[in-house]
Design a protein with these regions (language model features):
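General beta-strand structural signal in soluble alpha/beta enzymes
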Residues: 21-26, 41-43, 67-68, 98-103
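Residues on a specific face of well-ordered alpha-helices
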Residues: 50, 86-90, 94
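N-terminal basic/disordered segments at the start of proteins
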Residues: 1-26
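Internal, active-site/partner-interface "lid" segment
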Residues: 68-79, 95-109
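Short amphipathic alpha-helical segments and helix-helix/interface helices
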Residues: 11-15, 53, 89
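Glycine/small-residue-rich interface belts in oligomeric ring/scaffold proteins
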Residues: 28-84
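Short glycine-rich anion-binding loops that position phosphate/pyrophosphate groups of nucleotides
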Residues: 6-7, 44-48, 105-106
Length: 109
């Protein structure tokens, strides 16, 4: 998980739930985190999109990416919905976040 230190309380809640590692945001945070199977980013979608765009190569090998706002209102499955992001976004509903899932195969069920 990647978070700004100002969102420490939310980051700790998410870490406690998921058991993931916490990486404080830095210029290299996303490239460092791309070795993981999934990344939860506690920040705006805009920041996450700009940081992951140059790192993406294949839907089959890229990590799942979920973006969570700092108020835990929304958990957005941004990349890799079928490779873990949808499941993680749904898991975060335990903390009150509404999962945002946009895969056509999931939406039309």
């Amino acid at each position: 998980m990647i978070s700004f230190e100002r969102n420490r309380a939310v980051a700790e809640q998410v870490c406690d739930l998921t058991g993931g590692d916490l990486i404080w945001y830095s210029e290299s945070a996303f490239s460092d985190a791309f070795e993981y199977d999934a990344i939860i980013a506690i920040m705006s979608c805009g920041i996450a999109v700009r940081k992951i765009a140059p790192l993406l190569s294949s839907k089959w090998t890229d990590p799942a990416v979920v973006v969570v706002d700092c108020a835990l209102r929304h958990a957005i499955a941004l990349v890799g919905g079928h490779h873990g992001a949808n499941e993680i976004a749904t898991q975060l509903s335990v903390l009150g976040a509404d999962p945002v899932i946009t895969n056509a195969s999931e939406v039309v069920k």
